[in-house]
Amino acid sequence: MARSHAPAMCAVRPIKRIKVYSPNPANREAFAADMSAQLGIEVIALDSPDDAVSGTDIVCCCTNSFSHPVISGEAIEDGTFISNVLPMELGDDALARVDYTVKNQPLRALEHHVFSAGAPPADVTVRSEGAGWLRTVDDGTPLLSEVVAGKQRGRADRREVTFFSNNEGTGLQFAAVGKVILDSLEERGDVGVKTMPLEWFLQDMPD
């Protein structure tokens, strides 16, 4: 996720420097070297998540943490934009620093969560409609699509801390990648071949 977030942010903002933290020193150093070469900007690896967050305009939490927050509220400064990949990446103290939240979509898997050992069950207090594991949740939080369409406001001022809550993914990227793969097979005349290279479906350990 971090390796896709970095070029995405650089595509829409004039990023001058990226700071990265990972609990694995080798991974964060490799990420810094690779992204610096790819993006042509300074990328530095740091020894603590607070150092990475402090003084940063855009904070992207791209981890595999299902049960523990990865940033602290004390490190978040006024005017910061925050995004997450997993819901537990921001704890109560970090959420308390947020002034304005926009979420991905109104759908949540209320009865199909993945919990790590010892994690308490979800306390779902918002009103919901629907049946089974997929329900429509109305908690009053604006949607990203509504902000893009001009139906909801964006940032109110330069000091406002804003948060994009990735409450549930849509998986559209998988459909897009599938289309690219299919087009490639058609160009090679391989449509109908059922075996694809295994490396297309694997990745290295996360950063």
Regions picked out by a protein language model, each given a short descriptive name:
Residues 2-3:
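N-terminal Rossmann-fold NAD(P) dinucleotide-binding loop
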Residues 18-19, 44, 162:
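A structural signal for isolated positions on well-ordered beta-strands in alpha/beta enzyme cores
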